[in-house]
């Protein structure tokens, strides 16, 4: 199915078999999971979370409690994946390189499709104290692995904020955690904190989230 967002569109597809979703606890992966559940009923979702220092497992546990109650006719199974070293997280943005490789090696063949909420970086510079993620690696992986899909790869954060806002997905803002430097709250100066704020600023919206 095709979903419009501003001057662009995204495409989502249900398949026979398990639907895999990489869920980091961040805004974009939560938005993607919500869109899938909202549009495809009675599916079996296998949720992969890379266990990293940013508190990913803590936030995704709360997210899945909420999502499973909101969409009770779907089935959800979470698989916690060991992440790689701290310097690997920039390789794929929302996923550690080692953790993503684990998913491909051990789970990919049993999935009908594997979704990632990976987005493109904003077309601007803002001051930050951490490296910007090299998100092109996820695009390259999608070209190599047929069932690995990145429907947001052509969108930056301004579009995903708009998509969540237009669909009244307030929980996407309130429950997600974007900061990579603190497992709770926000440092306000890392690249991901700045990216998130930029997305809201482009839409002239206030961010209701505090995680």
Model-found features: residue ranges?
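Nucleotide-activated chemistry modules centered on ATP-dependent adenylation/adenylyltransferase
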Residues: 1-211
């Amino acid at each position: 199915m095709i979903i419009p967002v501003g001057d662009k569109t995204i495409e989502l597809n249900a398949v026979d078999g398990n639907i895999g979703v990489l869920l980091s606890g961040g805004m974009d992966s939560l938005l993607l999971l919500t869109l899938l559940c909202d549009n495809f009923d009675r599916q079996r979702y296998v949720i992969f979370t890379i266990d990293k220092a940013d508190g990913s497992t803590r936030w995704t546990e709360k997210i899945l409690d909420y999502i499973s109650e909101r969409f009770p006719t779907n089935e959800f199974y979470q698989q916690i994946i060991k992440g790689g070293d701290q310097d690997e997280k920039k390789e794929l943005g929302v996923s550690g390189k080692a953790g993503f490789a684990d998913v491909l090696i051990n789970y990919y063949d049993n999935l009908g499709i594997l979704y990632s909420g990976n987005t493109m970086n904003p077309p601007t510079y803002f001051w930050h104290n951490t490296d910007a993620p090299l998100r092109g690696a996820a695009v390259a992986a999608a070209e190599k692995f047929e069932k690995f899909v990145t429907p947001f790869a052509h969108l930056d954060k301004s579009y995903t904020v708009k998509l969540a806002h237009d669909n009244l997905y307030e929980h996407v803002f309130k429950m997600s955690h974007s900061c990579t430097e603190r497992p709770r709250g926000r440092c306000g100066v890392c690249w991901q904190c700045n990216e998130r704020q930029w997305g809201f600023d482009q839409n002239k919206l206030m961010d209701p989230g505090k995680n």
